[in-house]
Amino acid sequence: MQKRLLQLGLFTLLNFLSYAQESEFLGNFTPTISHLVPATASQVTPHQQIIKPNFKGRELIEVDQSNTHNPDWVWQQHATTEKIASASVMWAFQGLGTNMSPPDPTVDADSNVVIESTNSGGGAVYRIFNKNTGATIVSSLTMQSLGGSAGLGDPIVLYYKPARRWFLTEFSSSGNKLLIHVSQTSNPQGAYYTYSFTCTSFPDYPKYGFCESSDAFVASTNQGGPPTVYAMKLSTMLTGATSPFIKTTIGYTLNGFGFQSITPVDLEGDNAAPAGMKPLFIRHRDDESHSNGSPDSGTNDWIELWEMTINWTANTATVAKIQDVVIGEIDSKLCGLTSFACIKQPGTTNTLDPLRETVMYKAPMRVFDDHQTILAALATDVDGADRAGVRWVELRRASNVTTPTWVNYQEGTYAPGTGTSRWMPAINIDKFGNIIMAYSTSSNTAGDFPSIKMTGRKPCDPLGQMTMPETTIIAGTSSKTGDTRWGDYHHMSIDDFDQKTFYFTGVYHNSQTKTNVSAIRMNPDVLDASIANAFVPGTGTGCGSSTQIGVIVEQTGSTNITSGVLSWQVGSGAISTVNYTSTQLNGVGTTDTIYLS
């Protein structure tokens, strides 16, 4: 183990020196100010299927037909394990994007509403839902009405809780622009600042993330060659001031992939990132498929972490690979490395796009009291016969550090049963450490039409296992014919206020391509409690031998707690135990204070 850690540190140093990229300052951009305009009926529900031209570069690469497949040592082939979690769909409704190919749905929530956005015939449109019931508040609005250039789509919707602001984004139909609309207040139906950032070429597949510790709103795009990343100044965008726009490029492409993408890491929850943390970007590298980059191995593959260093005074930046984290073997050759056609459907020879090139949006990060977590999910060929499964990975490092010391805490490939493909995952984690993952499913078995399903796990479940039985969010009723485009991404967000409700939007097929918006919550165990906090009552300069400590116990299970046992240890001292009774632990989320002395 010590030898492996030493080697990892050496690789980190070499990659930093080899792959540091300088930036290009593209100028300062000042926003316009505008208000909402409803979308027209033709923008919301096109009568003819609309196919969005993007995923630049795939068509230029010859498909690799070689058949190298190493065993997937973390393949979860059975749906049930010794411990079972469960989740409930609180509500689910049809979303926007009907008959779009692809719809590219995205979703987030504030204290009152949920916003979903998709592609349409005239750029991105979005709908506002009641957060508690899922009822539609505003049927459909067009992002183009918010100002700037005409939009083309690829929307991403994000809510930034520290400032209570909405960020609505898409790319332009001409002029190579990223269009970013920032709400001037917490009201998503109020006025917006609209930024039009001009890129050096068409910014395909834009993905975004916040890094408050670097005062940055960052983006990644596919512009041909290595992925391009951008930095915008967060504090100025929140006030409607002029923002710098800084471009830099990831150090190298992944050979074989025509489409090059890297995903920004986006922080969830109220716990801040460590002071001085810089923006992170993440991608996977299947070294058998890509044959470039280092290190290289015949028995495992890699998660790459790249870090952006920004100088706002000089408007410059660099991006460098800081770490290669070992993961089990993945197989990116789902019908080769570039094909748009792979996933089987019932009753047709038409197959669907597997989206194997990218860590799917988004890559959430959450800070807990004793560690930091990043989640990643992607598609992999589980059997060498073009059946897709979902590889998911949880990276961890100690709390309050910014060093490149991430480790692979756990990983698994979710592909139970036989025949059915699972792809287009979206994953997130709540304040308790519960993980929910939703994805598309399909096979050529009769009735197994393109649908949306989910699984999940609790933090104390066996590592590498999704213990929640696969649950259908919405079942498809028909196969898609005519073209192979399915969706470029799904989106799973977390309620920033209760920090335990997951909001998901994804694609299914019911006579037409449609999207679904749903609210999901992990069910509590029947009898469970957790330590919410601890404190020293009163005031003083230090702890003496008889100092009393208060421990706040929170009920996290569904059964009320009337008594329990609490154990504690100071350093390497003896373990002490106290029996307690309670009349306050009478519902999920209720607390009681137990005093230790």
Predicted regions, residues:
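Extracellular/luminal regions of secreted and cell-surface proteins that mediate adhesion/ECM remodeling
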Residues: 524-597
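Bacterial Sec-dependent N-terminal signal peptides
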Residues: 1-22, 543, 550-551
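Short secondary-structure junctions and interdomain/linker hinges
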Residues: 12, 383, 399, 538-541, ...
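C-terminal PAP-associated
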Residues: 21-525
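Intrinsic structural disorder/low-complexity segments
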Residues: 5-10, 263, 287, 587-589
